[in-house]
Amino acid sequence: MKTLKATLFLLFFIHLGFGQKRDVINDQAIQFSIKQKKDTIHFILIDTKLDEIKPVFLFCQGSLPMPLFVKPAKESMWMIGGGITNFDLNEIKKNYHLIVISMPKTPVIVDEKHLNKSYCYIPNENEPDEFDKDYVQADFLENYEARAQKVLQFLRKQKWVDHSKLIVAGHSQGSKVATLIALNNKKVTHLGLFGANPFGRIDQNIRTYRKEAERKEITWQQANEDIEKTYQMYRDAYDNETLRKDPNLLSWKSFSRPLVNDWLQIKIPTYLAYGTNDIAADLCDLVPLFYIQNAKDNLTYKRYLDLEHNFFEINADGTTNYEKAHWQEVMNEFIKWTKK
């Protein structure tokens, strides 16, 4: 009888863990919220039910305050999801619970009238270039990492999560967030980096000015002036008084941290994928040299020829061909790698 009672209790407990009411958005994702004193962290799981136990795949999205879902005035709601709609979601869901965290101080669902042309959330539709002030103050690397760690702590307590594996990956700015998560969380088993800049962020501006001068799009005099202005902007980012007056500099300061130093400290399998026509990731070609110098063999890299930052093909005139996308191929190769 005691054994029967224990079994019934266990079954009841499991039923509660899997059967509680869910906040399902657009029949695509389940929303979760973690309330804190000064912030509420919203995140979504790309599914509508939790009847399978699977490992977590946390995808860290790129920059800018884009909502996870857009609500048009007349048409149906649709998902941005931090860019995951470019992926083969069914392939990912076969193996993992796919998680995406909302940008800080950014609603999960936003009416289309509160988006600018880049699909960024703007509180005032008459000021398309003005982001929410709270978002600007929260837009720094350490905050993104701290929020993600809270989400991972929550997920570790869920009965529908398989803890044998934890995949963390990010694209562009998200690769920086993913790096810090993996650096500080020993539960992470695989790290994926897409369109990453191994030397941070601000160096890209300087390299851009040089390339423009080399292509004679601007003079070397102009490039010199722009580079010097970039140095000054970065100095300002490290001046506390200037930083208080212009909180936008906080993002430049935190995200310009070189990643390659962190990567060399990470011992878990690391996957680096980038397009050869991506100026942000230009210097990824140097990364294997650092691993060789440090006798490290945990890096797998994939160089995608003639693709740009978001893995689209490039036309002969250098413009992006949005009809020829390769994100599904890129992500599926990564998923295959995580299963080896």
Where are these regions (language model features)?
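Primarily recognizes the serine-hydrolase "nucleophile elbow" in alpha/beta-hydrolase
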Residues: 151-210
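Accessory cap/linker subdomain of secreted extracellular hydrolases
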Residues: 119-134, 141, 192-264
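Alpha/beta-hydrolase active-site loop
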Residues: 112-158
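N-terminal cap/lid segment of alpha/beta-hydrolase-fold proteins
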Residues: 20-55
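Catalytic active-site module of serine/aspartate enzymes centered on a nucleophile-bearing elbow/loop
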Residues: 307-340
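Short beta-strand/loop motif that positions the catalytic acidic residue
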Residues: 266, 272-274
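Short, surface-exposed "cap/lid" segments of acyl-processing enzymes
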Residues: 50-95, 100, 106-112
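Conserved alpha/beta-hydrolase "acid-adjacent" motif
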Residues: 279-286
